[in-house]
From Swiss-Prot:
Gene (name only): prmA
Known function: Methylates ribosomal protein L11.
Binding-site residues, S-adenosyl-L-methionine: 150, 171, 193, 232
Catalysed reactions, as listed in the record: L-lysyl-[protein] + 3 S-adenosyl-L-methionine = N(6),N(6),N(6)-trimethyl-L-lysyl-[protein] + 3 S-adenosyl-L-homocysteine + 3 H(+)
Record-linked Pfam families: PrmA
GO molecular-function terms, A-Z: protein-lysine N-methyltransferase activity
This protein's record includes keyword Secreted: no
Family from the record: Belongs to the methyltransferase superfamily. PrmA family.
Protein name, per record: Ribosomal protein L11 methyltransferase
């Protein structure tokens, strides 16, 4: 059996309409993606914590999966009639039957961060069994560790973590930074997130890596200060959380902030200068790592 993948260019004001209508017309699935994803023009969507979702991207691709027997011309006519959109720009691709689990796994290879620090999919042999290998299951939510901000934070941790230092990973997601800190020799390691599924993912991944770390929902986080605070989250959230992250860092402690675009770096850095002596920013592609020392 085969399928047809239909990709339609869409604006921010019609992408959801197209996606919903395609499902009503019998599509097996429909999704919306940033048309500029994984390019320098990628458009992150930011919103203040607690605010409603700010919307979708300005330029989108709506992808629908259709049965191979679908009459594409008739479908597009019905789609146009139902939405009032007549100027579709689209492309199609035939997708053959295959072992989807194996196909998905083949997309993820071990990622070398630096030296012998690796991110290794759980089903893959480690390129260096004696290296510092962080085992992740990319089938879980909260990322695979391939994003530039993850690279920036992991490389910084490798330079900064000393034996028995305490580390707070705020916005732990998959737990990758907390797990790395523990494997790099940190003592007390705590991860925190606002999403219960992130906590479950972090606990699972920590168990996979046989490391001892504690994970809490933000509302349940015990008090205390840390030698190192790292937060790889949205820049808007970093701005709001600055006082809390400053309280979590002991005097002389270190902080690392990412999830920040180049054009947002000055604004975020200025906020944290109230509590930290900020270092020169480090860049990777269009992303920034900000670090500093607690006064």
């Amino acid at each position: 059996m085969a399928w047809i993948s239909l990709r339609i260019d869409a604006r921010d004001d019609n992408a959801e309409l197209l996606s919903d209508t395609l499902m009503e017309l019998g599509a097996l699935s429909a999704s919306i993606e940033d048309a500029n994803a994984e390019t320098p023009d990628e458009q992150p969507i930011f919103g203040e914590p607690g605010d409603p979702p700010p919307g979708i991207w300005q330029q989108n691709v709506v992808t629908a999966l259709l049965d191979e027997s679908a009459d594409l011309d008739s479908l597009l006519e019905e789609l146009s009639a139902a939405t009032g959109i007549t100027d579709f720009r689209y492309s199609t691709e035939t997708i053959a039957e295959q072992d989807w689990v194996r196909a998905t796994q083949s997309q993820f290879e071990p990622i070398r961060i630096r030296d012998d620090l690796w991110i290794v999919p759980s089903w893959h042999d480690a390129p260096n069994p004696d290296g510092l290998n962080i085992v992740l299951d990319p089938g879980l939510a909260f990322g695979t560790g391939s994003h530039p901000t993850t690279h920036l934070c992991l490389s910084w941790l490798a330079d900064t973590v000393k034996p028995d230092t305490s580390v707070l990973d705020y916005g732990c997601g998959s737990g990758i930074l907390a797990i790395a800190a523990r494997k790099l020799g940190a003592g007390k390691v705590v991860g925190v997130d606002i999403d219960a599924q992130a906590i479950q993912s972090s606990v699972y991944n920590a168990d996979q890596n046989q490391v001892d770390a504690s994970f809490y929902l933000a509302s349940d986080l015990p008090g205390g200060q840390f030698d190192i605070v790292v937060a790889n989250i949205l820049s808007s959230a970093l701005s709001v959380l600055a006082p809390a992250l400053a309280r979590a860092a002991r005097s002389g402690g270190r902080i690392a902030l990412s999830g920040i675009l180049r054009e947002q770096a000055d604004q975020v850095s200025a906020i944290y200068q109230e509590w930290f002596e900020m270092d020169a920013p480090v860049f990777m592609d269009s992303w920034v790592l900000l670090t500093g020392s607690r006064r």
